[in-house]
A protein has these predicted regions:
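Long Lys/Arg-rich low-complexity intrinsically disordered regions in nucleic-acid-associated proteins
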Residues: 1-145, 149-186
């Protein structure tokens, strides 16, 4: 258990949850607020998987086509816009917009790494891990997270997962509880 003002050690929480589950038990965590009310959370592990094409499934021709389109990109805010094209083989990257495709910052940076066979920077490791699982990621801003993560194309169902990188995660239980409340709208 913890007070709402207690700091969170996310690594410790992960280890504790795994230990509890290894004994065949349910990991329940209780947070006590300043009015002495208790909120209980069930903790678990998620291993998202989806149906999106993986980078390794693209043919050399498709990768070359993406490279040609990437060379035509236009900086837009913190992302990129790829103007007028006839086909886009990577549906999990970017969104259609004004006869082109808009890529968010992490999508464009990841695409650049893949197309140019560069070393993956540490800040893209989580994004890459999720891409390797075949999921589709969209901004999670409205839900208090970095990404909302889909196992199917957007619009077929609600996002089954919200993902927040640990370096952006709440630092105390009050902030974590607020994030959970916000995410319930998903």
């Amino acid at each position: 258990w913890a007070w709402t003002t207690d700091e969170i050690d996310w690594v410790e929480m992960l280890e504790w949850t795994n230990t509890v589950h290894s004994y065949g038990m349910v990991a329940e965590f209780f947070v006590i607020d300043e009015e002495m009310d208790v909120t209980m959370y069930l903790l678990g592990m998620a291993h998202p998987t989806g149906t999106q094409r993986l980078w390794s499934s693209f043919s050399n021709d498709e990768k070359q086509h993406l490279s040609t389109l990437w060379d035509e990109r236009i900086i837009r805010g913190t992302g990129w816009y790829i103007p007028e094209f006839t086909s886009w083989p990577c549906e999990s990257i970017g969104v259609e917009h004004l006869s082109g495709r808009h890529l968010r910052q992490e999508e464009g940076e990841w695409m650049n790494v893949m197309l140019n066979d560069l070393e993956l920077p540490s800040e893209l490791e989580l994004f890459n891990d999720l891409m390797l699982r075949g999921v589709l990621m969209r901004p999670g801003f409205k839900y208090g997270s970095r990404w909302r993560v889909y196992d199917t194309p957007v619009g077929e169902a609600h996002a089954p997962w919200l993902v927040q990188p640990v370096d952006l995660a709440p630092v105390n239980w009050e902030a974590a509880c607020l994030a959970v409340r916000l995410s319930e709208g998903v």
